[in-house]
């Protein structure tokens, strides 16, 4: 199938064509000049498309058919936990008492919403083993930055101004060193050993009196549990540093293990991942941060408290790092996460982890004969393959990903983590059936065979999508980085 053009809505515009009508004016007409100063009024008409209602419906329906989401198909994007989002979450989030309130309302009028927020914090405290939680951060990387700022404030409050370095593993999420840099730290990399885990000897080498924190994901980005976590925590704590938990992979340990029991001092969660807030479209997310007792004074203000008179926000926080987001976090996502936690209960959350781990190991073992398996051991919720053997045949991991598009699958994460050559990172989540997993596995096996027998079909993929192989060289050398006004076309 050749590339199919899809006109922009602006390109469909025809002067005089109308797609809506306004009700008859039943109030006195007011001129803009009487309400706004001239510098706030447009000098020229806005360039809005003039299209019919039918054109609008067909245009956006066509675009929606090109989208892929967890409601339309399998989404095995490693390190992203693209699980199904139960629709009961959406129903509850649309309750008028949640959907129609305003953050500037008096606290007495939103006690129900505040109770939900408080209860959610308490649930997250129990799930993570922390002592307190803030719901303010808007997403994962925002939570990382917030947690690091808390650690920075803690060290500075103790007069320890020389702790300027944050240690991250070579398999870490790219947001970890980025967040550390934005928080004012220098990042130091600790190597992985031959088993895909943090090398303890290298950790001992890089930890010193300048260490502010070690950032870890556990299980790590290779899908492997850091079995030496207690010793790692001891190494960092003995040096005066803090241990930070990146909650990206919490789906692998729900009701099985808690970061607080592993020795972590700070944790951020991704409610839009682990706790089924919808994600993948750019937001909104929710990245609550939990801390141990000695970091509570530095939590962003206000904090939500419960007294005999109800719920209220406490702004009297002299050591707080300040606000990290207007108002009180992305409330709608928090409602969805709360609904999910209450729906599942402790036993349900335990089953989430058990099935996520089972699905990942099943897929890994079925695919291992056809792709390189860098670390041949049981994984947790996700696993990493390598396309090294296919690369020797002239087929790159990128080609494999594009070939999957021909079969209607969203490709896994590729080329990450960076310490695995030709990396293919797969996370099936717990919500997928064996039949779905088998269908994807069969296509991956077919692609591996094609790489041997007919590599061109993989190298030139995709063949059935509306947009086929793009000119990567031209895109890199001559990217279009600025908006270009379209030329109207005949529709």
Swiss-Prot record:
The modification N6-(pyridoxal phosphate)lysine is found at residue 273. Its EC number is 1.4.4.2. Coiled coil: none annotated. Keywords: Oxidoreductase, Pyridoxal phosphate. It catalyses: N(6)-[(R)-lipoyl]-L-lysyl-[glycine-cleavage complex H protein] + glycine + H(+) = N(6)-[(R)-S(8)-aminomethyldihydrolipoyl]-L-lysyl-[glycine-cleavage complex H protein] + CO2. Gene3D superfamilies: 6.20.440.10, Aspartate Aminotransferase, domain 1, Type I PLP-dependent aspartate aminotransferase-like (Major domain). One of its GO terms (biological process) is glycine decarboxylation via glycine cleavage system. One of its GO terms (cellular component) is cytosol. The keyword Oxidoreductase applies. Its cofactor is pyridoxal 5'-phosphate. GO terms for molecular function: glycine binding; glycine dehydrogenase (decarboxylating) activity; pyridoxal phosphate binding. It comes from the Bacteria. Belongs to the GcvP family. C-terminal subunit subfamily. The glycine cleavage system catalyzes the degradation of glycine. The P protein binds the alpha-amino group of glycine through its pyridoxal phosphate cofactor; CO(2) is released and the remaining methylamine moiety is then transferred to the lipoamide cofactor of the H protein. The glycine cleavage system is composed of four proteins: P, T, L and H. In this organism, the P 'protein' is a heterodimer of two subunits. This is Probable glycine dehydrogenase (decarboxylating) subunit 2. It comes from Bacillus cytotoxicus (strain DSM 22905 / CIP 110041 / 391-98 / NVH 391-98). The lineage of its organism: Bacteria, Bacillati, Bacillota, Bacilli, Bacillales. The gene is gcvPB.
